[in-house]
Design a protein with these regions (language model features):
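Short beta-strand to alpha-helix junction loop
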Residues: 4-15, 39-48, 84-103, 227-232, ...
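A short, glycine/Asx- and small/polar-enriched loop/turn
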Residues: 44-48, 74-81, 122-129, 264-270, ...
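Dinucleotide-binding Rossmann-like beta1-alpha1 core, especially the glycine-rich loop
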Residues: 1-70, 201
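Helical element adjacent to the flavin cofactor pocket in flavoenzyme catalytic cores
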Residues: 84-144, 301
Length: 313
């Protein structure tokens, strides 16, 4: 619902949500459909909330607009002016998901090479010569090359010598902190404050053990620094207490840091996933993916299907 109707982020997130639930059922991956509330804590946010609701409906998302009276009955401890309820939202055990996908690759005779550096790729006639190093340098010859390397996608795109550098999008690193909360709380669902142009804001979420955590914030950094800056705690407190005034700051403890590979600049609005094939860049057999950040996990299986279709054309 956050993304323009027809964008890759919108279409692949909606399809990916359904595919993930189906895949989790088949593979016995832990997940829960717990629903999500997108909240307005002030009356002057209701117009923006209504626009988000209408955009979600136009994209085919199942949503319910919740009145102030109803949302206050549901969450009497929160300061809320209105909300949107998304019943299909949920949580999934990402390590279990990755393990299942790893098993599928190996079952289909694929090879996963860990701790391996991508050195370069050159196109010769119909094949890519891909040079790698896992302690020893080796080559792979393939008709297809898919670059889906996240935080390193800009660096690795530069190493694909057949590709014009104008198709290489600069990656901007958006660092996000998460705090866990150890006290009592009023939440049984995901709670997302209204997003701004740059991120979805500091939301309340859970893991499958029921641990409540808040995050992420957004801090633009120049390198892959995963250290936790505890000075951001005051910003978290201010943000959370706008809708949960009784939150106890002493129960808010550092949890972890993540970094998102954004292709938007710090002062730019959200940008769509970049998934480029030969019709755009002219290199047959190459699919180049950049800016696969949120909602990347939800979209992941749909992205895989989308890339497979591009290769079949």
């Amino acid at each position: 619902m956050y993304y323009p109707t027809g964008s890759l982020k919108s279409t692949l997130c909606i399809e990916g949500n359904r595919l993930l639930y189906d895949y989790a059922k088949v593979k016995n991956i832990s997940c829960k459909k717990i629903g999500k509330y997108i909240i307005a804590s002030k009356e002057d946010e209701l117009e923006k909330l209504n626009k988000l609701y209408n955009q979600g409906l136009s994209s085919g998302v199942s949503l319910e607009m919740i009145t102030k009276e109803k949302i206050q009955n549901l969450f009497p401890d929160l300061v809320l002016a209105g909300a949107i309820y998304s019943p299909e939202s949920g949580i999934i055990d990402v390590p279990e998901l990755v393990t299942a996908l790893e098993g599928d690759i190996q079952h289909n005779k694929g090879v996963i090479s860990l701790n391996t550096t991508f050195i370069s790729a050159t196109k010769s006639q119909n094949n890519f010569k891909i040079t790698c190093n896992d302690g020893n340098e080796f080559e792979i010859n393939s008709k297809i090359l898919i670059n889906s390397s996240g935080l390193n996608s800009e660096i690795n795109t530069r190493k694909i010598f057949s590709l014009d550098n104008k198709y290489n999008l600069p990656i901007n690193l958006a660092k996000g902190h998460y705090f866990k909360y150890s006290g009592k709380h009023p939440f049984n669902n995901l709670i997302y404050p209204l997003s701004n142009e740059f991120s979805q804001g500091i939301h309340a979420g859970f893991d499958l053990s029921g641990q409540l955590r808040f995050g992420p914030d957004i801090n633009w950094v120049s390198n892959l620094d995963f250290s936790f800056d505890e000075s951001v705690k005051d910003n978290f407190i201010d943000s959370i207490q706008q809708y949960w005034p009784d939150m106890n700051p002493d129960k808010l403890q550092p949890d972890y840091v993540g970094i998102r590979p954004k292709i938007q600049n710090p002062n730019e609005k959200m940008r769509d996933f970049s998934i480029l094939d030969s019709k755009i860049h002219g290199v047959e057999g190459l699919i180049n993916l950049q800016g696969i950040e949120s909602p990347g996990v939800t979209s992941s299986l749909a992205i895989g299907k989308f890339v497979a279709k591009l290769l079949q054309k």
